[in-house]
């Protein structure tokens, strides 16, 4: 891979996450956003290294104060606050999902890989809400997972539909060629 791709691909991924994170609807301690849609799409289309670097760069940009987190949030406190579990587990989501998918993956494989990654983000979210916000596990599940099951399933279905034609269009580009 060309050296420029090593830097450009994660930067594009981080920018996509930052833009879609701004589409945010506050519905309690955890807002509804499209950042996990961006991460799922990146994880499905990018290789594991670039997918994880995209999320890592996104987290770094937010930590140093750029308003890239949901609703324009920024600062290191977001990485140790109530929603930190979700943010940190986005690294797991991107790496795992990217490792399980490739340009030959079908709808079901893409769906299941993203479902697994998203589920792990929920686990991280519950852990963060419990330990960092002092919320009982049951309440963390009720406010941090249940309201998002249907919307996230819809996002994963959209990722599964969008990524196949996207991968087909990109497969002749240097980075995406097998």
Regions found by a protein language model. Name each.
Residues 1-50:
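Hydrophobic transmembrane alpha-helices
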Residues 2-6, 48-53, 103-109, 136-137:
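Membrane-helix interface segments
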Residues 16, 20, 24, 42, ...:
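Alpha-helical membrane-inserting segments
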Residues 1-3, 29-30, 70-71, 102-103, ...:
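Helix-boundary and loop/linker segments of multi-pass membrane transporters
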